[in-house]
């Protein structure tokens, strides 16, 4: 079945072209496939396709900044769901919609919500579009379809938001990989995996920032270069103590030490 899985670079390319694709998560997680598209490309035809052929809940994946900009509160202040999916209250565009549930109305709500010029005055709650807040750090922090949709949209140079919809079988059961492959063949869609997206980001993202460097003198070894790095995902700081000059052509002995404030 691996031959039906496209490299994540191809999935990013599909997103950049405004095309829909299927994203699959791990078997030991939700073990499902979602129809995914960058939110800025989610027109009425796309919403109708998702409703007709995905059959799951059509959701709007947003980053934390946009959720705050829209003033959206979480659906639950005590999230006990299995995967802690961060649903916010549902939304509707304040202007231009009728009942709110039509494909056109939901597409309008989505385009209104993701606009750079939109704020909380442009939407109302509740509504027929279901935003989900992605974790800062994306799939490197949480390996969910929400984070994957936002990550891929960003990597594709799009508005950092996505529309996702779980794919279900005709009988109402969840589509697994064999069924997802048939859906992909039928509609000429590419399939990618969240696992490949995680690997891609690990290999290509620069998530460590060098924030400070100074020379210190210690009774244990004399002079050292003390370099402080910050992890951009969780803001944790890491300290490297370097003795002497590092030659990239030589093997350098490294010792990793877990900090204990009370004993060090």
What is the role of each PLM region?
Residues 1-264:
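Catalytic domains of riboflavin
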């Amino acid at each position: 079945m691996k031959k039906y899985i496209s490299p994540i670079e191809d999935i990013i390319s599909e997103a950049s072209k405004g095309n829909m694709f299927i994203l699959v998560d791990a078997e030991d997680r939700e073990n499902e496939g979602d129809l995914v598209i960058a939110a800025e490309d989610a027109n009425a035809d796309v919403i109708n396709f998702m409703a007709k052929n995905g059959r799951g809940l059509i959701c709007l994946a947003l980053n934390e900044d946009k959720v705050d900009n829209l003033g959206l509160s979480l659906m639950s202040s005590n999230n006990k769901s299995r995967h802690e999916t961060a649903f916010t209250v549902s939304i509707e565009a304040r202007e231009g919609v009728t009942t709110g549930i039509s494909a056109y109305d939901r597409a309008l709500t989505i385009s209104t919500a993701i606009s750079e010029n939109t704020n909380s005055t442009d939407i109302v709650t509740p509504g027929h579009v279901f935003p989900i807040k992605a974790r800062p750090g994306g799939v490197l922090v949480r390996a969910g379809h929400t984070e994957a949709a936002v990550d891929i949209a960003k990597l594709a140079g799009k508005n950092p938001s996505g529309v996702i919809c779980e794919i279900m079988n005709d009988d109402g059961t969840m589509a697994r990989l064999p069924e997802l492959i048939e859906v992909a063949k039928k509609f000429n869609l590419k399939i990618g995996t969240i696992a490949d997206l995680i690997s891609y980001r690990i290999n290509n993202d620069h998530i460590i920032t060098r924030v400070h460097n100074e020379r210190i003198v210690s009774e244990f070894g004399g002079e050292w270069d003390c370099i402080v790095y910050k992890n951009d995902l969780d803001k944790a700081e890491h300290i490297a103590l370097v003795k002497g000059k590092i030659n990239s052509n030589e093997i350098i002995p490294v010792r990793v030490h877990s900090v204990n404030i009370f004993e060090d």
